[in-house]
């Protein structure tokens, strides 16, 4: 079947984030104290979803796009690409790009050399906000509660795919923001978004869920398994060797104003 799609125009690439930082409108006094907010914005980091049924793969007449069976990463063989841009047209997420200089398409490679070595992707490891985790998701009928991704996606269902209505089964999952009107989030993440937000709001009452979230950005290696051990969460690699141990609640150290050892006053500057 012919895949319906569209090619972005030059202006789409020239100003990809135009207006995204703008949030204007009338707000009554005290409205910021209630949620969802009447005026709101949020950042949505988007990468290639490495879909189970990639639209770019189906659209390419040169068969230059393929999905690796061992890890599900979708790659583009540039030696076969002739720059028809059908992959760009076929991807509804627009995460395949045409390089006007090389005259071939290019896309995220899922950092497959790192993944082969048991390490997380570059965007995951360099995220200063520690909002990302990368790993392997099991099928819904083979869920392992010790797998942090299975626990977030299949068990607690707090992480949802973006635009599931496209039918491509994207493999990047998002924890929805809590301050945005549900009607807007529903069209982005599907009908489970209200329950996901309700579960996330009660994360302080769920040590295991809190532990899984604490693993975000805790180690450069892929955590295949995890468990909560007292006040800490422990991550394990594929061989169940410990690779990370992080306190669920960050310890607080209060320093005395006067340092008697150095006979000096401490001053906090922020």
Please provide the spans of the model-predicted regions.
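Non-ligating segments of multi-cofactor redox enzymes
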Residues: 1-270
